[in-house]
Design a protein with these regions (language model features):
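Catalytic-pocket segment enriched in acidic/His residues
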Residues: 190, 198, 202-214, 218, ...
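A secondary-structure capping/hinge motif
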Residues: 192-198, 241-254
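Hydrophobic side chains within alpha-helical segments
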Residues: 45, 208-211, 238-241
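Conserved structured core elements
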Residues: 203-206, 233, 237
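Alpha-helical bundle regulatory/interaction domains
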Residues: 1-175, 179-185, 199, 216-217, ...
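The DNA-recognition helices of helix-turn-helix-type DNA-binding domains
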Residues: 195-196, 207-210, 246-247, 258-261
Length: 284
């Protein structure tokens, strides 16, 4: 999706929250897009027109406050008018300690949050309307700080492993991660799945896909064989196969069907942000 302003988390949340972001987009262009699988979990507050989820069971109207958990296929959300939203982008191990809920990517498309969150979403809608996104994000962070970490969680090892996965674009060996956590491979996988509802190997694939997608958006003409080498795929065919398993399209299809990003690529600040955000020094 086409994120606009990005806000850094306050120190209390910095280890478990990647960022906060705000989005405004007209209905037509928003409804052409899809949420591709991503290595983060989005806690979305809709402050604009109603949103509906397209699924195999039909259309489902979404609550104001909901979670987009880890996905393994594209997610289609449609707006009934002008789209306005703000989101907290969580690392997946932080769902339990920050939201006090479980997130299972294999069975749940989105997770509606409880009544307190829905009331808070109504308040944020008014704040955005009258005082803007910056103040709304400040209020969002304050609300999360008051409700997060209510219970004791031993996150240090899994948090460290997760950041190592991100830093390596999903290419670090699972045995090496387990060793750095001073756990056996089976213990490491069990603890990782307890907090993320996904195996570390499966999560590494999503991390790698996210970095690959970002590299293509920054430079759609980059050679796929070069990307395969950078990301540790056995060859170009392997890269395309993996990409299609998450995106339901080829890498070139994605680049050709994302006109908003073609326009954004003319903005040097956006390209610099993407390169730094995903460590894309080779995608220039």
């Amino acid at each position: 999706m086409l994120h606009q302003p990005i806000y850094a988390p306050v120190p209390m949340l910095a280890a478990d929250v990647n960022c906060f972001w705000a989005l405004e987009q007209d209905q037509e262009s928003y409804n052409r897009e899809v949420y591709l699988p991503d290595a983060y979990i989005e806690v979305i507050i809709n402050v604009g027109a109603p949103l509906v989820l397209e699924s195999e069971h039909g259309m489902l109207e979404l609550p104001r406050a909901f979670v987009n958990p880890l996905q393994n296929k594209p997610l289609r959300i449609r707006a009934a008018g002008f789209c306005q939203m703000i989101s907290m982008q969580l690392y997946p191990w932080a769902v339990k300690p920050i939201l006090n809920i479980d997130a299972d990517p294999s069975t749940v498309h989105v997770i509606g949050l409880d009544a307190d969150w829905q009331r808070f979403a109504d308040d944020l809608t008014q704040i955005v309307a009258h005082r803007g996104y910056g103040e709304a994000i400040d209020c969002y962070q304050e609300y999360v700080c008051k409700t997060a970490y209510r219970h004791k969680h031993d996150l240090m090892l899994i948090r460290t492993a997760g950041h190592l996965l991100h830093g390596s674009h999903g290419q670090i060996r699972m045995a090496d991660l387990a060793t750095q956590c001073h756990l056996s491979p089976s213990q490491f996988e069990r603890q990782f799945k307890h907090y993320t509802a996904i195996s570390p190997k499966a999560y590494a694939r999503i991390v790698r896909f996210g970095s690959l997608q970002a590299a293509l958006l920054v430079n759609p003409s980059i050679r796929l064989a070069d990307l395969a080498d950078v990301y540790g795929y056995s060859d170009q065919a392997h890269l395309i196969r993996e990409f299609k398993s998450f995106a339901d399209c080829t890498p070139r299809d994605l680049a050709a069907s994302a006109p908003a990003y073609f326009e954004l690529r003319q903005n040097e600040d956006w390209c610099d942000f993407m390169k730094q955000y995903f460590n894309l020094s080779y995608a220039g």
